[in-house]
Structures are given as C-alpha cells and as structure tokens.
Design a protein with these regions (language model features):
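Conserved catalytic core of nucleotide-sugar-dependent glycosyltransferases
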Residues: 92-120
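N-proximal low-complexity "stem/linker" segments adjacent to membrane-targeting elements
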Residues: 1-60, 64
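Local beta-strand N-terminus motif with an aromatic residue
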Residues: 16-18, 79-80, 104
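Residue-level marker for beta-strand->alpha-helix junctions and adjacent short loops that shape enzyme
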Residues: 25-27, 89, 113-114
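Short beta-strand-to-loop acidic/aromatic patch adjacent to the donor-nucleotide binding site
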Residues: 77-92
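Alpha-helix C-cap/termination motif
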Residues: 47, 72-76, 102
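Short, well-ordered alpha-helices that flank and scaffold nucleotide-derived cofactor binding pockets
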Residues: 39-42, 71, 101
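Short, conserved alpha-helix that lines the donor NDP-sugar binding/gating region
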Residues: 62-75
Length: 120
C-alpha cells in the first residue's frame, strides 16, 4: 500500500474502533486464521485504527458465544464496529479495510468451503 492510499484510508477510518470477535471452541484456532489476524493487527496499527481482538474459548454453542461477544460490543460504547471471524477461516486483512470503508450498516464477505470438490 502506497503512502497516499494509506493516508486516505487513515483519514476515512479515523473514527473507527473495531472489535474483532472469534469464538474458539476448546481454545483452538487454525494457523491460517492466526496469520491473517496478526496481519490485520499489523495493518490496523500501521493505519492508527483502534482495535481489540476478543476470543471466547469457554462456550461450546457458537450462537451463545456470538451472543456473549455481541454483549461485549454493546456494553462498550467506544466500539464503532463489530467483526465476527471464525477460528478456521483464512482471510486477507485488506478485505477488512474494504468492509470498513463500505459505510454499510451490515455487510459480510464470502469464503470458500473447507474442501473444494474439484470434480464438479
């Protein structure tokens, strides 16, 4: 990312405080998720975007875990954005910036199935 683009993004997202939530049943996450999230933290830090990574490993039901994480977001009015990422997903940190810059109230992103059926 060049300096001009970084400055534009920094200005556009200066108000953002992002809570990244990942339910990690059994305290486990995939290495691809870890690499992606470390990259996201580096990118957000470089751009001066406030953020927090929140994992929950003590809940076996994903819906209940997400509800608990949503309560954390709602309970802290300093957060402006909530992002759920599953612990088995690899993603491009730049995609998170595009989602934040979309200015939509709710948005999502596609990701491939865990196994590709090459015969189809």
């Amino acid at each position: 990312m060049n300096q001009e683009t970084a400055l534009k993004i920094k200005q556009e997202l200066s108000h953002v405080k992002l809570l990244v939530c990942t339910p990690c049943y059994g305290g486990q996450c995939y290495t691809g998720y870890l690499r992606s999230t470390v990259g996201l933290v580096q990118l957000l830090t470089q751009l001066g975007i406030e953020h927090e990574i929140y994992t929950l490993d003590s809940e076996s039901l994903i819906t209940r875990a997400r509800n608990s994480m949503s309560a954390r977001f709602i309970g802290d009015e300093s957060f402006t954005h909530l992002l759920f990422i599953d612990a088995d997903i690899t993603y491009n940190p730049q995609t998170v910036l595009r989602l934040l810059m979309s200015k939509k109230q709710v948005c999502g992103a596609c990701y491939p199935k865990k196994v590709l059926n090459w015969d189809k």
